[in-house]
């Protein structure tokens, strides 16, 4: 019941913040140059066809009821799609509504995000502390693109509360171009800290839970997005010969959300290095993934076994924030067979 209360509180608040953040991000001028993609509905007749679309294109939405994926498609591939037998419907109005490049000024960059985190630590030293849990790829391999960043988290809670409290772990921005998610993570942390002692829900959460917030799990990628590119992945450019500057269809890096050790290389990931869903050369090949897995493992004792439901009293909750699809997803992503907990 406690977990359900936490989830309900969070989802309602999150929905409001995502709407506000997305609305703020939408307040940008109509572009003067054509966008680098065409928005189109790509229709599919099977799960295999959908997977091929996901692997080869930047899918923004999947409408299972009508059997299409809304995708950003490179203009020079539209004819080849149609020749291959794919039903394609181009949406010119929506295509022209998106900018060819640029970074919305309403979103903070990595430097701003780090400064806001530091401000919270300074303002509420009894309730929040920073934790360094690793390094970004560029931090270990600096080059002309930059020197990289330390990976940081905020740990929130009443220091006087008993040890062994359940964990609420919130992670944002593993996909760099999903710019609303770090803003939402910061807003969530700020609301808990500002509300402690006056707001019943915020006080209850910080008194009874450990709350860990990662504002950006992919700072290198975020910095690329700040330059106006549709970067999704991290900054590892050692595999493949990819487009530079990056495009939404062709970019260097590894999709950190496809690089985790568990069930690596299965449904929903790509083996092509320049694909936006490239999974990396091996499970947890990326330093960001390794750091995150070690950090989480140090906070949560795994009680999971394949094919066996989680114990009913499992208290911890991990949420990964994304600004794509308007979905609430739960494990597993590598199979269509429901989890034993469903």
Predicted regions and their residues:
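M14 metallocarboxypeptidase catalytic domain recognition
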Residues: 23-342
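Bacterial N-terminal signal peptides that target proteins for export
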Residues: 1-11
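Bacterial N-terminal signal peptides
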Residues: 9-20
């Amino acid at each position: 019941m406690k977990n359900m209360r936490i989830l309900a509180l969070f989802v309602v608040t999150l929905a409001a913040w995502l709407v506000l953040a997305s609305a703020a991000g939408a307040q940008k001028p109509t572009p003067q140059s054509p966008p680098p993609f065409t928005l189109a509905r790509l229709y599919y007749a099977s799960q295999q066809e959908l997977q091929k679309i996901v692997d080869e294109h930047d899918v923004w939405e999947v409408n299972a009821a009508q059997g299409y994926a809304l995708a950003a498609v490179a203009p020079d591939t539209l004819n080849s799609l149609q020749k291959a037998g794919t039903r394609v419907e181009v949406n010119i109005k929506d295509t022209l509504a998106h900018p060819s490049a640029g970074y919305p000024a309403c979103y903070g960059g990595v430097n701003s995000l780090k400064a806001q985190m530091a401000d919270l630590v300074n303002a509420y030293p009894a309730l929040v502390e920073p934790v360094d849990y690793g390094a970004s790829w560029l931090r270990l391999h600096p080059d002309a693109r930059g020197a990289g960043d330390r990976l940081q988290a905020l740990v929130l809670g009443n220091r006087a509360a008993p040890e062994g409290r359940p964990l609420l772990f919130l992670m944002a921005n593993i996909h760099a171009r999903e710019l609303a998610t770090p803003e939402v993570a910061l807003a969530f942390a700020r609301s808990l800290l500002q509300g402690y002692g006056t707001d019943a829900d915020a006080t209850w959460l910080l008194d009874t839970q450990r709350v860990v917030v990662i504002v950006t799990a992919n700072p290198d990628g975020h910095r690329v997005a700040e330059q106006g590119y549709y970067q999704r992945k991290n900054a590892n450019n050692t595999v493949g010969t990819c487009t530079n500057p990056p495009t939404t269809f062709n970019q260097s890096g590894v999709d950190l959300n496809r690089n985790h050790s568990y069930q690596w290389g299965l449904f929903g990931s790509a083996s092509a290095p320049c694909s936006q869903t490239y999974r990396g050369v091996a499970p947890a090949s990326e330093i960001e993934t390794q750091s995150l897995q070690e950090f989480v493992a140090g906070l949560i004792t795994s009680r999971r076994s394949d094919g066996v439901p989680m114990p009913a009293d499992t208290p911890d909750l991990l949420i990964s924030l994304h600004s794509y699809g308007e979905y609430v997803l739960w494990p597993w992503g590598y199979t269509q067979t429901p989890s034993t907990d469903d």
